[in-house]
């Protein structure tokens, strides 16, 4: 009997708490969410990464990597083939269909080493030295750059991963290629 009444007491307390919280839900102040644009005029923005200081690195799929500094200035850092206005151009990076400049992330120790990592489609390793079971070698690569202190340019491109196959043959199926 003692166990049963203890159980019933627990159920009663739980039910009361549930009832009280549901009736208070109607009178609670709920937060409102608002959206605001912090940067406009982009073409197919794909990814963003933020420094602790508030600078925003971002990629545009068919253009390249840029940074919007906390002061509001925008610096175009790494451009793709056929893009203009960037501090450096990389003719091996291309955009076609679903392929292009995609991910960006900052090194956990960015403040000290200034390293940024970028994923993009490249034809740099097409042909000679290409190791794949597919008939073509265009693929995605992961690059590392060092960002200048003034955030206006990058240097020391290092291709870290060179053989991420993105599409073995032409088709109408979307699996990461043209």
Residue ranges, per PLM feature:
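Bacterial N-terminal signal peptides that target proteins for export
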Residues: 1-11
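N-terminal signal peptide c-region/cleavage motif recognized by signal peptidases
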Residues: 20-22
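Acidic, Gly/Ser/Thr-rich repeat motifs that build Ca2+-stabilized beta-propeller blades
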Residues: 25-178
């Amino acid at each position: 009997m003692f166990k049963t009444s203890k159980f019933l007491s627990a159920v009663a307390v739980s039910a009361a708490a549930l009832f009280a919280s549901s009736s208070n839900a109607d009178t609670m102040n709920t937060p409102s969410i608002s959206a605001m644009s912090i940067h406009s005029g982009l073409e197919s923005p794909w990814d963003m990464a933020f420094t602790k200081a508030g600078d925003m690195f971002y990629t545009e799929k068919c253009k390249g990597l840029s940074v919007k500094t906390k002061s509001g200035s925008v610096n175009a850092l790494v451009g793709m083939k056929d893009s203009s206005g960037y501090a450096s151009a990389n003719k091996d990076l291309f955009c076609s269909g679903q392929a292009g400049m995609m991910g960006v992330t900052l090194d956990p120790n960015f403040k000290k080493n200034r390293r940024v990592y970028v994923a993009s489609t490249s034809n740099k390793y097409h042909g000679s030295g290409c190791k794949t079971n597919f008939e073509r070698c265009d693929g995605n690569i992961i690059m590392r750059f060092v960002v200048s202190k003034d955030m206006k340019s990058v240097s020391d491109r290092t291709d870290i991963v060179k053989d991420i196959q993105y599409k073995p043959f032409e088709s109408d199926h979307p699996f990461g290629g043209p």
